[in-house]
Amino acid sequence: MLPLVLYNYARVLDLCGRYEEGAALAKEGQDACIQYGHYRFLPNCLEIEAECRHFMGDEETSKELYYQSYYLCKIIKYNVGLEVIKQEAKEYLNIQFED
């Protein structure tokens, strides 16, 4: 439950333009996913942190996080998340993922 709460709160902060706080909570969400072995929201938390890092001007970290989220979505066959990541990565960083 904690990863879901952290993901949702990080998403709200991201949408409000509070990128540093959003990135920190998304990272906390990732840590909670790993700590408790609940990986369902791990790609989402990675995606939120990637978007926040982009808007904070940290393109290298953002790029790495988008790649991690993309491949995790592919592994778990989370197609909705995959499409979001492909769209954002292309729009923000000009990354073209191949299928």
Which ranges hold each PLM region?
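"A position-specific structural signal for the A-helix of alpha-solenoid helical repeats
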Residues: 1, 8, 41, 48, ...
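Tetratricopeptide repeat
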Residues: 22, 26-29, 62, 66-69
